[in-house]
Each structure stands twice: as C-alpha cells, then as structure tokens.
Amino acid sequence: MSLSETATQAPQPANVLLEVNDLRVTFATPDGDVTAVNDLNFTLRAGETLGIVGESGSGKSQTAFALMGLLATNGRIGGSATFNGREILNLPERELNTLRAEQISMIFQDPMTSLNPYMRVGEQLMEVLMLHKGMSKAEAFEESVRMLDAVKMPEARKRMKMYPHEFSGGMRQRVMIAMALLCRPKLLIADEPTTALDVTVQAQIMTLLNELKREFNTAIIMITHDLGVVAGICDKVLVMYAGRTMEYGKARDVFYQPVHPYSIGLLNAVPRLDSEGAEMLTIPGNPPNLLRLPKGCPFQPRCPHAMEICNNAPPLEAFSPGRLRACFKPVEELL
C-alpha cells in the first residue's frame, strides 16, 4: 500500500513548525541543581529532519522529554518552545495529552518496554484511534491494519492478533512507528529508535522513516549517538555536549567540514570501510559530571586544541550562513 493513500494534508515546508528558544532543563537533586539542557535554540520546518547528536548525558533525550512534557517530577523547564505558533512548555495536562496524541508523537528507544505485554498489538493500536479520533472499533481496526501496511508490516491483518513478544525487535519498532503515526502528527520525535537493532534492520527502519517523512510531510527530531543514522536521514544536525550546543548546521556541512573539536572527535570515532587495519580512534576521557562542570568550555578537559582562553565559556556564534559553533579555535585551523 502506498503511504499517500493514508496521508492527510500537512503544513507547507516553508513554514516554521517548531521554534525552540533558550530551552533550559534543570533537575533538583540532593547534591544540588543539575542543568541537563542549557540554553538550546533551533527551528524545524515541516518535512525537515533534525538530528540531535552527542554522547550519553549530553542532554539529547531530556530535550525531547521537555518538549513532550515528560520530565521527571524534579525537573524544571525554562525558555520557550513554540509549536505551530503555540507555546507548548508548561501546558496544562489535559491540553498536553491532546497535543501529544494528535500533533506530536514519540518513538522510544526500546519498543519492548513501550508496548503493553498483556495486550494484543491490534488492541493497543485501536485504543489510540478510539480514544483520540472517536472511531468505532471496526473503523479503528481497519485503520490500524492500513497503518501497519504502510510501515511494511508483513501480514498486517494477522499481526493485529499477536502479542508484542511474538514480534522481532525490528517488527516491534515498526509497530511503535505505526502507533506514533496513527493520528497523523506534524512532529515525530525518535529517541534512539535503532539502538537495539542489528545493522540490517537499522537500515530498513531509516529507509522507512525517510519514506514516511516524504509521504506525510512530517517533521522529525532524530535523537542518536550514531552519526551513520544522521547521515542517512537528517537535513540539519545539532551537536550537544554537557547540555550545550557545540555545533549546528546542515548535515552535509557538519559531516564534510566539522568545525568543532567535539564534532571532529565524534566523526573520527566512526569506523570506516576504507581504513582496514587502521587504529580505532576515540575521544579521550569521559563526559563531565554535570554537578561539577569544568570552568569555561565543558569540552576543554578532553579537547586536543584546548587553550588558556578556553577557561572562559565560548559563545555560540554564527560563522557562515546557517552554521553555528561554540569554540575559540579559529575555523580555518580546524578545516
């Protein structure tokens, strides 16, 4: 089945769908406040994909949880996030539930823990449509089958009667993608959607998301540590470290001409098929403890280009159209 058979009209690509300004996420802990996301800024248009990249603890997932209103109870949000012209941070719970169901959806990292093991997959899909679209049970069943077909689930009608444990990891992730798209959201947030999958299934899921993006004109935020995933699907890339933006720009620019030592380190750590026998490169050290961040640039203790001026926090500045970075090292010395 063609995805276009189930697609509905979406905003024109020229329109800014999501605008995030100075997003800040802080958690109160017994040891003090931890700032997980520090003054994050980006925009996303309909049909675009933004990749948010970084090591564990960089603030990627907390950015997504803040936008979805899913922070832990000790979390606090600052800044602004405007979706379709509407401020969505700190919305009342009822409005937030409606927004999450009908406008913004999320694919979580582990589909096995996101699906109810005691309910048939079909029942879980149908529940979304009956609750949020007011469909009858028969209508919800047929629409769920159509969406499973759309995500290329083999024998979709038969699979409706199966339980999550009867599916492979890749098939469970297809179920989660189908569920996320049932209400035709304008924004899809995918949090490490291929981490637990083998490389063949990863490629299939990435191809599927690309097709869905084109057919539904859905904007996607792809949260990942895998730069190969970013290269395959993203239009823009935001590189995060210790809750801050290190580099931001078009995906092809960041890949072929990275201009921040952290971005360069991440790319150098990706295994290459044309470097047989070459040493596997890594970034020395570990991400910082957010309770005890180093003075100045948070990447300074691990940076091969660290200078005395790095004891001051580098501002995030534009150095060419559409590109930002936070680093004192001259651009030409990193290219």
Swiss-Prot record:
Its chief place of residence is membrane
TM region(s), chain numbering = none
Q: Which PROSITE patterns match?
A: ABC_TRANSPORTER_1, ABC_TRANSPORTER_2
Q: Does the keyword Chloroplast apply?
A: no
Any one GO cellular component localisation term in the record: plasma membrane
Task: Name any one Pfam family assigned in the record.
Answer: ABC_tran
Q: By its UniProt entry, which CDD domains does this protein fall under?
A: ABC_NikE_OppD_transporters (cd03257)
Q: Which residues bind ATP?
A: G54, E55, S56, G57, S58, G59, K60, S61
Q: What induces it?
A: Part of the opp operon, which is constitutively expressed.
Major enzyme class:
translocase
Keyword tags: ATP-binding, Cell inner membrane, Cell membrane, Membrane, Nucleotide-binding, Peptide transport, Protein transport, Translocase, Transport
Q: Which reaction does it catalyse?
A: a [peptide](out) + ATP + H2O = a [peptide](in) + ADP + phosphate + H(+); L-alanyl-gamma-D-glutamyl-meso-2,6-diaminopimelate(out) + ATP + H2O = L-alanyl-gamma-D-glutamyl-meso-2,6-diaminopimelate(in) + ADP + phosphate + H(+)
Membrane topology label: Peripheral membrane protein
Which Enzyme Commission number(s) are on file for it?
7.4.2.6
What residues does the ABC transporter domain cover?
18-267
InterPro entries recorded = AAA+_ATPase, ABC_Ni/Peptide_Import, ABC_transporter-like_ATP-bd, ABC_transporter-like_CS, Oligopep_ABC_C, P-loop_NTPase
> What stretch or stretches form a coiled coil here?
none
The places in or outside the cell where this protein is found are: Cell inner membrane
Gene3D superfamilies per the UniProt record, alphabetical: P-loop containing nucleotide triphosphate hydrolases (3.40.50.300)
Q: Can you state the subunit structure given in the record?
A: The complex is composed of two ATP-binding proteins (OppD and OppF), two transmembrane proteins (OppB and OppC) and a solute-binding protein (OppA).
**NCBIfam families annotated for this entry?**
oligo_HPY, PRK09473.1
Family under the similarity heading: Belongs to the ABC transporter superfamily.
Known role: Part of the ABC transporter complex OppABCDF involved in the uptake of oligopeptides, including the cell wall murein tripeptide L-alanyl-gamma-D-glutamyl-meso-diaminopimelate. Responsible for energy coupling to the transport system. Plays an important nutritional role and is involved in the recycling of cell wall peptides. Binds ATP.
Protein name as catalogued: Oligopeptide transport ATP-binding protein OppD
Q: Which organism is it from?
A: Salmonella typhimurium (strain LT2 / SGSC1412 / ATCC 700720)
Q: Which gene encodes it?
A: oppD
